[in-house]
Each structure stands twice: as structure tokens, then as C-alpha cells.
């Protein structure tokens, strides 16, 4: 019998035991932002290997690990599960784009050190609301030029859909916490166009 594929996991959140708020997308997203570094610091080696072992016992043979910080790469590489390791890139500020790209390149190079038939370094553009077009262009170009697998979060909620289509709604209010005059970087069509041919 073939193994299952879990194409989108976040092992960096393996330590989550009720820290994140579920239900409303924006409340959940706020709890992720507030807790992600703490959860990532708590999710190391043994805990990640335990979570992978639990997935394998349930019949999962391949995962798509979405990695913000890269700390779970070694555990994934040692676990025996086939891992497409999506190094995530994001950043809404044009002024910080070069720094975000540099940090991504460093993490991506670290993940390449584990490359094997069971560990495939890949790219993830976080989302259209959190990733400046300059960063998206960099990531999609890297994927094209190196024939890398790429992923993204897209249209995960009605809030995001309204934001991308009309530039208004609760997402605009939420994004105003980070930018006093938020405006969408993309329409749904223009975001998808970045991934053409991938």
C-alpha cells in the first residue's frame, strides 16, 4: 500500500499545546506571530523526531515541511521520512527586502547541506499579504533557475480574498498595525502570475 503525503506541515510548531488561537483567521494569525519564535525555540531535535515518528506510524511517508527558521532541517534529514523542505521567505517592507533575501539565502544554503533522495530543499513564498513583490520575484526566479519545488499560502480566508480583490475589510485593519497605510501588493491574478511556469 502506498504511503500518504502530508504536503504542508509546520514542525517548528511541534511544541504547540494550545498556545495558538483557532477559529477566526486573523486571531489565529496574530497568535502565530506572537508565539512563533517561542514555539520554534521549544521545538528542537527530539520533539520534532517524535512528531515525525507519529506521522510515519499513521502511514505518512512524505512531508512538505514549511520552515521559517531552518532549525528542523537536521531532524527531518535524519528521520527517514521523505521531506520536501520548503525554506520560507517573507517580508512586506521594501526597505528590508535585501536583508530578508540575505537571511533566506543563508538558511537555504544550510538546508542544501542535507540534500539527498529523502531531503529535497525547496522554496516557499509565505503569502501575498506578507511578501513584497521584490521578494516574490527573487524566490520565483530562484525556483525557476534551479528547478526547485515552490509553495505558497494563498486565499486562506475570506479576509484575504476581500483584501486582494478590493483592498478593504478586516485584513486592512489588521495590517494597519504594521503599516499605517496598507495596500495590497497584488491582485489574485498578478500574484499567481509570478508562479507561471513553475
Give the residues covered by each predicted segment.
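A cross-domain feature marking catalytic cores of carbohydrate-active enzymes
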Residues: 9, 66-67, 85-89, 125-127, ...
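Histidine/acidic residue-rich metal-binding segments in metalloenzymes
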Residues: 71-75, 100-198
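Proline-centered helix-kink/hinge sites
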Residues: 2, 37-38, 125
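Histidine-centered catalytic micro-motifs
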Residues: 3-14, 149-158
